[in-house]
Amino acid sequence: MKPLFTGTGTALITPFKNGEIDWDALDNLVESQIAGGVSALIAAGTTGEPSTMTWDEHIEVIRFVAERAKDRACVIAGTGSNCTREVIHAANVVKDFGVAAQLVVTPYYNKSTQEGLVAHYTEIAEKTSLPIVVYNVPSRTVSYTHLRAHET
């Protein structure tokens, strides 16, 4: 099986200035990463602090990064949420921006069972067309998707 991604990827921060997204700083960040040889950019992953943004801002960050990186680096869009329907909605919106995949963090705070996590990711896979990068970060989410769960 051929890998979806090769090379180096950077999880981007989302710069803010006076409580608003600093689009010029984000543009400079994207350009500097691409100039440095990065082949993938992760937009609105946990490093980008999407939990501190509105969904409109979250989606706009992904759109902005995808537009700036077009044909120069692939973009992996952070679509994760506790709400499966929100993940599906976000993925179906950002696919039109030309992103390569979606980064989906395990649902946090609610502490799902493995069966619940499998149901979450299965529904996302069934209702979206973007490849899913399962993002396990148990120190933040208090849950972990075991590899065996993905065999189902």
Residue ranges and their predicted role:
Residues K2-I13:
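N-terminal amphipathic/basic leader segments beginning at the initiator methionine
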Residues P3, K17, W23-V142:
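Active-site beta->alpha loop and helix N-cap motifs at the rims of alpha/beta catalytic domains
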Residues P15-F16, A149:
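Hydrophobic pocket-lining residues within nucleotide cofactor-binding pockets
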Residues T145-T152:
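Conserved small/polar residues in nucleotide/adenosyl-binding loops
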